[in-house]
Amino acid sequence: MSNMARLEAIALVLPEATRVDIEAWDGEPTFRVRNKNFVFTDPEVTSVSVKLPLEEAEAVVATDPLAQPTGYGMGRAGWVSVDIGQGADEDRWQQVTEWVRTSYPLVAPKTLARIVLEEDGLVD
């Protein structure tokens, strides 16, 4: 399975999630909920950028040598870019899944965010 197919399988199961390729960015893919990005990537999905709570973002950057704050000042808001390369192992894809599912509720409307948080056992 290609990296894009894997990422789509993770992101597009979330409520009202869509993939939008940004023409002005040479077709760079994004995943959105109601026009708000929760994942940025490249066409080959060799890296992903996700929004995390600031403390978690700082911890990921401090402990993962393939992670860095996302550029354009987005890192200050908790966005992290992580290299996943081609042929990432299952542990890395599990991390990507967790990060995408963490990013989504941070940008989604509360009613949609709650659905994911409930699925993940994070709210009653």
Describe the predicted segments one by one.
Residues 1-124:
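Charge-dense, helix-prone N-terminal extensions
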